């Protein structure tokens, strides 16, 4: 049985999700909704500065475009309630615009001739289940209509924090994501549409302090860590490839080797482990949601207690997208 998917919003995440779905048997994108001209969408699908050229054929046709010989309808509806997903058999919508990230807004896809399920590609709030695949995807029972795939940083932080907490118990912690610049920053100095004075500065020429909700959102993914973590972000002049540092106090004293052994034991398709001396460009395109770097683990003795620092890499574009697609595929499989 083929699961038919619709993508609302064909930006960075929407296009990369489309790419990944091309390689998954039993999942097919049948409609894309985006306000941008299809010629532009096809061009941006075919050519990608950070992730490389699309490995396939893309040809614009009337009403959409043809990818590897398969026609995908493209519509341009502003209101999700007006998207006729059912005509193309769409069962699950990947909501990737950033504008319909709350449950009530995302549910518009389910109205009229809508779909059956929605996966939001952003933090969704307390009234939807927030899923980081291979960390807490077992909270889903298939009856849900709208779920959130969290954020790219939460997908990096959560498996590392869970492995640390399961093994040693986290008391409190501070995280910092050293994050690639994104499309919500200015390329050159100029007014920021959201009024953020720092994001109004040239993203490719500055380290830009920024907020992140990843640490606080961790409680939606790992309830036992609710209220125990806080953090911030530093946007840096690279187009993709980011890293999360987590500094914590633990319930017990540990060694670097013990921490690294626990992380290696917890590794899986979503949470990788490396002892190589890598840099950010080395993780562009990786499918791990989080790649633990054992070379950066630190333990400091402080008056009989310890401060522990752990570090994990992520491609804020592809790592996150890979996790979203894993979640979508699983959600479709258990749907009731």
From Swiss-Prot:
Kindly list the residues the record flags as site (Activates thiol group during catalysis). 179
GO molecular function terms noted in the UniProt entry: glyceraldehyde-3-phosphate dehydrogenase (NAD+) (phosphorylating) activity; NAD binding; NADP binding; protease binding
Question: What are the positions of the active site?
Answer: 152 (nucleophile)
What's in the GO CC field? cytoplasm
Q: Where does NAD(+) bind?
A: 12-13, 34, 78, 121, 316
Q: Return the CDD domains for the record.
A: GAPDH_I_C, GAPDH_I_N
Q: Which UniProt keywords apply?
A: Cytoplasm, Glycolysis, NAD, Nucleotide-binding, Oxidoreductase
Record: residues binding D-glyceraldehyde 3-phosphate: 151-153, 182, 199, 212-213, 235
Q: What EC designation does it have?
A: 1.2.1.12
Disulfide bond annotation, renumbered to this chain: none
Question: One Pfam family name from the record?
Answer: Gp_dh_N
Quote the pathway field.
Answer: Carbohydrate degradation; glycolysis; pyruvate from D-glyceraldehyde 3-phosphate: step 1/5
Coiled coil (UniProt feature) = none
- Read off the InterPro entries from this record: GlycerAld/Erythrose_P_DH, GlycerAld_3-P_DH_AS, GlycerAld_3-P_DH_cat, GlycerAld_3-P_DH_NAD(P)-bd, Glyceraldehyde-3-P_DH_1, NAD(P)-bd_dom_sf
Which terms does the UniProt entry file under GO BP? glucose metabolic process; glycolytic process
Q: Which PANTHER family match?
A: GLYCERALDEHYDE-3-PHOSPHATE DEHYDROGENASE 2
What additional remark is attached to this entry?
Binds human plasminogen.
- Oligomeric form and interacting partners: Homotetramer.
Q: What does this protein do?
A: Also binds human plasminogen.
Q: What is this protein called?
A: Glyceraldehyde-3-phosphate dehydrogenase
Please tell me the species this chain comes from: Streptococcus pyogenes
The gene coding this protein: gap
């Amino acid at each position: 049985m083929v699961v038919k998917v619709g993508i609302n919003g064909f930006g960075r995440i929407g296009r990369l999700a489309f790419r990944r779905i091309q390689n998954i048997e039993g999942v097919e994108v049948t409609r894309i909704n985006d306000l941008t001209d299809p010629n532009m969408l096809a061009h941006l699908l075919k050519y990608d500065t950070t992730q490389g050229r699309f490995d396939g054929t893309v040809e614009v046709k009337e009403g959409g475009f043809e990818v590897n010989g398969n026609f995908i309808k493209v519509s341009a509806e502003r209101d999700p309630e007006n998207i006729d997903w059912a005509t193309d058999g769409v069962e699950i919508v990947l909501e990737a615009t950033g504008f319909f990230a709350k449950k009530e807004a995302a549910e518009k896809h389910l109205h009229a001739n809508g779909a059956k399920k929605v996966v939001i590609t952003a933090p969704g709030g307390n009234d939807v289940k927030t899923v980081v695949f291979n960390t807490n995807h077992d909270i889903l029972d298939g009856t849900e209509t709208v779920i959130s795939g969290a954020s790219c940083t939460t997908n990096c932080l959560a498996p590392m924090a869970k492995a640390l907490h399961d093994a040693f118990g986290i008391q409190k912690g501070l995280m910092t994501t050293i994050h690639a610049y994104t499309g919500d920053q200015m390329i050159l100095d100029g007014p920021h549409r959201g009024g953020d004075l720092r994001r109004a500065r040239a993203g490719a020429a500055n380290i830009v302090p920024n907020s992140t909700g990843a640490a606080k959102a961790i409680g939606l993914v790992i309830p036992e860590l609710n209220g125990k973590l806080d953090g911030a972000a530093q946007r840096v002049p690279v187009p993709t490839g980011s890293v999360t540092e987590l500094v914590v106090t633990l319930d017990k004293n540990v060694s670097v080797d013990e921490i690294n052994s626990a992380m290696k034991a917890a590794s899986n398709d979503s949470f990788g482990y490396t002892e190589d001396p890598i840099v950010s460009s080395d993780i562009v395109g990786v499918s791990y949601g989080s790649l633990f770097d054992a070379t950066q683990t630190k333990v400091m003795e402080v008056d009989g207690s310890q401060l522990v620092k752990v570090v994990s890499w992520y491609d804020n574009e592809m790592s996150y997208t890979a996790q979203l697609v894993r979640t979508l595929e699983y959600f479709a499989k258990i749907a009731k």
